[in-house]
């Protein structure tokens, strides 16, 4: 029987190690990936929500790699696996800043992973988005670049 604390099918393609090492890291992890955050959600809001499930050791906000501004994800690390499992059960799919957030297991934060991996610096999922999402910067970044008005006055 599947529970909300089971591993999802997502695997970090940049993980340094074998598939079995990654699986083991995920099964032992106390770190969660939190996605679909508003760009305006604060670390304090995240802490308030996730601390309801246990003592939060650290929160690492996801940043646009060029602008160093929040880009809609973070990592939340707990002191124990049981606390992280409680967050997987009770926080995944809840609303924060009017958005349904996604929570998934993470193999553990490593410096550099706090930056978006998209070509424009943010998350890949925001580059090709064609819908308008005020909480995630408007239209997708690549679409915004195509429709941006010419400011050269030529």
Swiss-Prot record:
InterPro entries: NCBP2 (IPR027157), NCBP2_RRM (IPR034148), Nucleotide-bd_a/b_plait_sf (IPR012677), RBD_domain_sf (IPR035979), RRM_dom (IPR000504)
Region (Disordered): 1-23
Keyword Nucleus: yes
Intracellular or extracellular location(s): Nucleus
Any Pfam family matching the protein: RRM_1
Domain called RRM: residue spans: 30-108
Protein name from the UniProt record: Nuclear cap-binding protein subunit 2
UniProt feature, compositional bias: Basic and acidic residues: 9-23
Name of the gene this protein is made from: Cbp20
Assembly behavior: Component of the nuclear cap-binding complex (CBC), a heterodimer composed of Cbp80 and Cbp20 that interacts with m7GpppG-capped RNA. Interacts with Ars2.
Major localization class: nucleus
Entry GO MF terms: RNA cap binding
Physiological role: Component of the cap-binding complex (CBC), which binds co-transcriptionally to the 5' cap of pre-mRNAs and is involved in various processes such as pre-mRNA splicing and RNA-mediated gene silencing (RNAi). The CBC complex is involved in miRNA-mediated RNA interference via its interaction with Ars2 and is required for primary microRNAs (miRNAs) processing. Also involved in innate immunity via the short interfering RNAs (siRNAs) processing machinery by restricting the viral RNA production.
Similarity section: Belongs to the RRM NCBP2 family.
């Amino acid at each position: 029987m599947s529970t909300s604390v089971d591993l999802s099918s997502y695997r970090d393609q940049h993980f340094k190690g074998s598939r079995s090492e990654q699986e083991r890291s995920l099964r032992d992890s106390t770190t969660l990936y939190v996605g679909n955050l508003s760009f305006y959600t604060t670390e304090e809001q995240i802490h308030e929500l996730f601390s309801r499930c246990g003592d939060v050791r650290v929160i690492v906000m996801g940043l646009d790699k060029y602008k160093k501004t929040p880009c809609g994800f973070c990592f939340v690390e707990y002191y124990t696996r049981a606390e992280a499992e409680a967050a997987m059960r009770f926080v995944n799919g809840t609303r924060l800043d009017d958005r349904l957030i996604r929570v998934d297991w993470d193999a553990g934060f490593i410096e550099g992973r706090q930056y978006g991996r998209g070509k424009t610096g943010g998350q890949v999922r925001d580059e090709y988005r064609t819908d308008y999402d005020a909480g995630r910067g408007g239209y997708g970044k690549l679409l915004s670049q195509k429709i941006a008005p010419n400011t050269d006055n030529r």
